[in-house]
Amino acid sequence: MAEKKNQLLKITALLYAIIAFLYGLNYLFFPELQIKMSGTEPIHPAWIRWFGGAMIALGYGSFRIFRNPAKQGIFVTTLCLGTLLVGLGLLYDPIFNWDSSFNLLEQVIPAIVMIIISFLFWISLRKSKEILW
């Protein structure tokens, strides 16, 4: 029964791990590509390269949850809150600081994905309480 309760948690953790690894590797090793795709003014790649390392670390933690979710409630809570804040942060500029130079797909689609993942982590927290805490 406990395995059924944490199935959503495992799927969500694996999905987030894959997304975090892909974005992390891209930001860490190819920041110039991200800058070019954003359509904004060029910046020094080091300004966003650090973000790649942080994303890889979060992806690794999420993969660890996928493998063994026992007693990982605090990390799942952190991922739930973090993905929500990232999603809302990505939506801020298109809503409040609209500029025709924005690459809307690069901001809105990841924002929606992060908000959905946050919601899935939140549901997983509720369903898997006895496993996570």
Residue ranges and their predicted role:
Residues 51, 75-92, 112-117:
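Hydrophobic alpha-helical membrane segments
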